[in-house]
Amino acid sequence: MFKRATGLTVAMLGMVLTAPAVAQPAAACQAHGQAALEAWTQGRFDQVGKDFAPVVAGKLTPEMLRQVWGQLQSQAGSFRSLGALAPRSLGGQDVLVAMLTFSDAPLAAIIHCDAQARIDGFRVVPAASVQPVAAAPEPAIAGAVSRAMPVPSPLGLLPGTLTLPEGKGPFPAVLLVAGSGPHDQDETIGPNKPFRDLAAALAKAGVATLRYDKRTYAHAAQIDAKAFTVDDEVTNDALAAARLLAQQPSIDPRRVFVLGHSLGAMLAPRIGQRDPRLAGLILLAAPARPLLEISAQQVREQGQRSHETAAQIAASEQAILAEQKLLAAADPRHPPVGSFGGMPQRYWLSLHEVHQVEVAKKSSMPMLILQGGGDFQVSPTLDFSRWQQALAGRPQTDFHLYPGLSHLFMPAGKTETVADYQTPAHVDAKVIADIAAWVKAQPAR
């Protein structure tokens, strides 16, 4: 469930191992944290936890550290360098941050210590997520009017932007729900901003949008990792945002749609199930299979492209198989303890209980399902085709496959790795035109 640079493997780039209390960065903490990161990046996994606090040492075994390190490299590319830890304030909390440079995507390590300078927080996130949340002012969009619209969440407001067409309205509106990982409201991936592309072009076509920073981006330091679920990551904030959007005078409350991308698309039927007032659902690159099944496919394919050994790939596949068996036998009332791939078992169990295709089949909402033919993360044959087969004959359901487009609905690259996302591009105009036409053709609910 990372996308990881965008994506489907939550374990990898969003590795949240603890939810520390009050950080106290000091010389001893800095020394311990730097030594732990050096041991980890050099493959000395049995030495990483020398200065871990008991709460972390019990979760991050040498084998778990080895496993996550392999996942990071399979998704972010080969490791290049480790920077020095430096004090930072994230979400109102003092921590230590060091940059990790990989061939395909930059990451950041975040270290937190307790009062005894023992490491009680150790996580890795996309480098962009440690940048200040207060970004530069929203650039003007020709033919549109944008204004700030924060979305309420239990951890605090999520910065958001409402983009309206020029004119009086009320307008049909689309709520943009991002994929897995800590994403800003533009769903920024390298130099690309797919959600900003959608907001700008849809406004010109007469459709309003609301996009917002994810909770994992805006308030990462406040998240309780032990209790974190996929509804906390996606569903609940999307429902709050949809209600807020429908309340705006410039928006037609009977024509509010949800557009989900990747994990956001996987959760779109669940969002529609919980808010029957929505006018329809738009799924971009929607996984039809369980996320761990997709992760296993990614481990094989990305591992081969990254020149991992057969033994390394097999070990990663076996770990995923063991996790699948654990979740299949788990009691939802008593989630397994511990974590997998850096995420708590409660989170994995919440994903295991998502049955997006079955929920979609029972829904009466109009649906538009879009897929890039060059997507190496969500499969055009194993996922998109499954949606087509399962929903064949379902009323008010439309499908579009776009040959040559990537997971971001931009021109697909040649490497079939996340390195392709570092090439500047924009969401294909045909995709946006199809979305706008479909939205405007749907009746008010």
Which positions does each model-derived feature cover?
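Accessory cap/linker subdomain of secreted extracellular hydrolases
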Residues: 280-362
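Short beta-strand/loop motif that positions the catalytic acidic residue
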Residues: 363, 369-371
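Alpha/beta-hydrolase active-site loop
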Residues: 227-249
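Short solvent-exposed beta->alpha transition segments
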Residues: 30-31, 35, 46-91
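Primarily recognizes the serine-hydrolase "nucleophile elbow" in alpha/beta-hydrolase
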Residues: 244-302
